[in-house]
Amino acid sequence: MYKRQGLDDGSRLPVPIFTPTTKAPIGEHDEPMTIEQVQHVVGTQVAARIDVLARRILARGNEIASANGIIIADTKVEFGIDRTREDHTGGPLIVLADEVLTPDSSRFWPADQWQPGRAQPSFDKQYVRDWLTSSASGWDRASGEAPPPLPDEVVEATRARYMEAYERITGRTLP
């Protein structure tokens, strides 16, 4: 589909895309929702505010990350609604409900290595996903079995990627 639109793996989109999903039970994948489905669940005005909030969070994250050599390829932002409280619009309070802009919820790419048309090096959990789906793990996701424990070298390589993302974005090192 994207190839027909002139996009390759790793292509920069002209504008961010808002792709809402349901919250699935632990161990299952969230299911995509249409904007109409979101509007049906939370109402048109709340759906529009969630869209704006998600885009603002990504825009601010992109400002900080790009100034520090990181591309945020995508991110997940989870919201909840507190119907017992109102926000400044008089509607229900929308609450940021989970981590935001971390290597677990986003794909961070080094800008100096970005090259459309190929898989990108990353500072996120993709390394773990790649190992789990490799023959080295011996795991078949379709088996219904829990994934195997991660080898120390996979844990260390993942930790190093997360630390590099932190250090690039913040300009600080951790002891």
Segments (PLM) and residue ranges:
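A long amphipathic alpha-helix within ATP-dependent nucleotide-binding catalytic cores
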Residues: 41-73
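C-terminal helix-cap and adjacent tail motif
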Residues: 100-165, 169
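Charged phosphate-binding loop/patch that engages nucleotide di/tri-phosphates or the phosphate backbone
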Residues: 173-175
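Conserved metal-phosphate-binding beta-hairpin within the catalytic cores
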Residues: 72-98
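A short mid-domain helix/strand-loop element embedded in enzyme catalytic domains
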Residues: 10-44
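Short, small-residue-biased leader/transition segments that mark boundaries at the very start
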Residues: 1-2
